[in-house]
Amino acid sequence: MAYQSEYALENEMMNQLEQLGYERVTIRDNKQLLDNFRTILNERHADKLEGNPLTDKEFQRLLTMIDGKSIFESARILRDKLPLRRDDESEIYLSFLDTKSWCKNKFQVTNQVSVEDTYKARYDVTILINGLPLVQVELKRRGIDINEAFNQVKRYRKQNYTGLFRYIQMFIISNGVETRYFSNNDSELLKSHMFYWSDKQNNRINTLQSFAESFMRPCQLAKMISRYMIINETDRILMAMRPYQVYAVEALIQQATETGNNGYVWHTTGSGKTLTSFKASQILSQQDDIKKVIFLVDRKDLDSQTEEEFNKFAKGAVDKTFNTSQLVRQLNDKSLPLIVTTIQKMAKAIQGNAPLLEQYKTNKVVFIIDECHRSQFGDMHRLVKQHFKNAQYFGFTGTPRFPENSSQDGRTTADIFGRCLHTYLIRDAIHDGNVLGFSVDYINTFKNKALKAEDNSMVEAIDTEEVWLADKRVELVTRHIINNHDKYTRNRQYSSIFTVQSIHALIKYYETFKRLNKKLEQPLTIAGIFTFKPNEDDRDGEVPYHSREKLEIMISDYNKKFETNFSTDTTNEYFNHISKNVKKGVKDSKIDILIVVNMFLTGFDSKVLNTLYVDKNLMYHDLIQAYSRTNRVEKESKPFGKIVNYRDLKKETDDALRVFSQTNDTDTILMRSYEEYKKEFMDAYRELKMIVPTPHMVDDIQDEEELKRFVEAYRLLAKIILRLKAFDEFEFTIDEIGMDEQENEDYKSKYLAVYDQVKRATAEKNKVSILNDIDFEIEMMRNDTINVNYIMNILRQIDLEDKAEQRRNQEQIRRILDHADDPTLRLKRDLIREFIDNVVPSLNKDDDIDQEYVNFESIKKEAEFKGFAGERSIDEQALKTISNDYQYSGVVNPHHLKKMIGDLPLKEKRKARKAIESFVAETTEKYGV
């Protein structure tokens, strides 16, 4: 194929959109944009305006109401009706988007709109709906990394998207052969929220031409914005649904409204089933002939996480009470078309209040059941069916039941629900980057290979549980976890779950960890949780304790660590606190290893959980559900979910993946072999050496194209190193891979120096560079043990009496600072150097190093503020006020900033504003840790 420029790609797209039904208009600046919006507003509201178009004053009043809002607020205004007072004091309501009759909106397309705010910018392709720029398309020529278009959008959004451009709902980026879409937001745009579009069979639609044909037809695009974008009230963000979610909702709605049949949706764990099922419920609840939509979840899933998720999509959606009489009242309340409740509560309501629910013997009702593979629904289904005679049932599951893994009564998911309406399998989700693949290790803990994981029953003359829980084996497994945990979790950047076969096993492992933990320099934070039975079987006197006593000890340990006050009388609160802890950490601390039997292995989502240790038998849906706790997408430093099996579950893993990915080829789901990654590394290393034979030669590169080649080559190498480190056989030596750790650190330092240089140049001046939009993937480079806290710990250990030892400590810190990859530490690098060179030598043994460093930073910060204010001729106290506000809110107060800058010429004002914003952000990061 001949070379195609960005201009040619843009022109081709404009022609295609015109053929699809968009009116091609010429809009070159903000004034023309406003004039076009006003014209269409008058046309669409001609009846209401009664022949009197909006006057200048009226239009200005409208702009005052809709301009200057956040992206989130703009999205709400877009979907609402806005009252406008006319000059004659009458009032009319204006709408900006027809969210029900999608094709009745007016569709236009323009290109090369120029705007000038902080910097001048020219946008590629802008799609206008009813005159508002709702979709922005940014293009790169073929061969350019699509991430550069993403970074350009981020830059434009920060510097240029103001006025009506705050109404952009969605961005589309493409290099002609790869195309993605993502929602606009006030918060940081994340690469993980860039989605591919696909067809109903989950085949990607990559090329820009095919994408436009499928996704950007006028009615389809308006439908996508109106129906399949969600305003998340809790997080105040816009969410775009993924293609498989859209197709599943449409298939379910069609089945519910055009037939009387049931059905189920099979979407893999971690693919966003909650949003899909809730959106389907919401749309069905708006159908006139459906009297009630009842969303059913299992009681154990209606925890704080589920409530939080549901209420994001519609405030107050979750019925939190377990009072069945209230559920009956809600069922009879015609103003509540949608109810979210538990399976157990619904069963009780039917059993005790059948006469009060008489109307539902004839009224059409739709039940939507989350995690419908569970046996509880099969048991309850018969009871509900007897009462709700005109009901349809739709299930959502990530792991359906087939003949191989049927429920206890032998039924499959298809037996209960009928046909599968849509599938999105684990292989699809991994391919699209919506979940991660798995790296699975099998650790042999027996010399006697005859005892296999499938021997989970009592075999004649052999008590297998006794063997599994032998003191020697339990300690062996515990030591293996302790010795490898930092490697698996990237120096405890991530959390883990350890699942074991029984409560007895959990207690034994907890006590072993507790004993061995005392010998560690940096003890692991261990927690345990299980449900005890009030009247417990003592297993013929073998166990000399009640499990509640042991749980009380675990909770007491937890209370001491996290300053809480739980007990076995408040296990629900303990559960919720652990749930929050494993997701986000508590008070700058978090659980490293959570030991469970079955809890947290289904329905629990945590992006910062990356490792599962397994010492129990798992198969089919239980295995996939447990493994899937680790594979939520987070950032570049988490390339896969790590599974460490202490039983031979190889066959069970292969069988489960075969069933739930519908393929015998598991290579797309499991990590490749060490040898394959090693070969890939060797190739990448050779490529890097061809560009820059030694690290110091990076300093000699003058050409930006060559510098870009270095960045891309080292970035690839770093990604492969990240994967190699997951393997036990990996050694960072010249003998093993041809490169040692020191050489890698030297290349990394040069890479980070280029990153700092580009970041600094971008902040200081509007310099166009091919490096501006390159994706450095800095998170992948970080070594989370070498950070500010790490350095402060070394500082505290300096022997202030022994000058020779002091010099050795100082030299150690200097070496670490030279190779610092933590962003905050790099900012503090010069400060710490000055402190150890000029302050530490003058201290004596009675001085508090922590306090001395705080005092030193305070003096330096004061000097920086005084110097910057003096250089810019601005008020120092006002600058500090802005900085304090920023430290609290993360936003530079525009009112204070405007007041401080004063009446400078426009160009100088922009320059001053940019300089102050950069100074405040950098000093906050520099002195705020």
Swiss-Prot record:
Gene3D superfamilies the UniProt entry points to: 1.20.58.2040, 3.90.1570.50, P-loop containing nucleotide triphosphate hydrolases
Domain Helicase ATP-binding: 254-418
Catalytic activity: Endonucleolytic cleavage of DNA to give random double-stranded fragments with terminal 5'-phosphates, ATP is simultaneously hydrolyzed
Binding site for ATP: T268, T269, G270, S271, G272, K273, T274
GO terms, molecular function: ATP binding; DNA binding; type I site-specific deoxyribonuclease activity
TM region positions: none
Pfam families: EcoR124_C, HSDR_N, SWI2_SNF2, T1R_D3-like
E.C. designation(s): 3.1.21.3
Keywords from the UniProt entry: ATP-binding, DNA-binding, Endonuclease, Hydrolase, Nuclease, Nucleotide-binding, Restriction system
Record's function text: The restriction (R) subunit of a type I restriction enzyme that recognizes an undetermined sequence and cleaves a random distance away. Subunit R is required for both nuclease and ATPase activities, but not for modification. After locating a non-methylated recognition site, the enzyme complex serves as a molecular motor that translocates DNA in an ATP-dependent manner until a collision occurs that triggers cleavage.
Assembly with partners or alone: The type I restriction/modification system is composed of three polypeptides R, M and S.
Family according to the record: Belongs to the HsdR family.
Miscellaneous field: Type I restriction and modification enzymes are complex, multifunctional systems which require ATP, S-adenosyl methionine and magnesium as cofactors and, in addition to their endonucleolytic and methylase activities, are potent DNA-dependent ATPases.
Protein name: Type I restriction enzyme SauCOLORF180P endonuclease subunit
Lineage: Bacteria, Bacillati, Bacillota, Bacilli, Bacillales
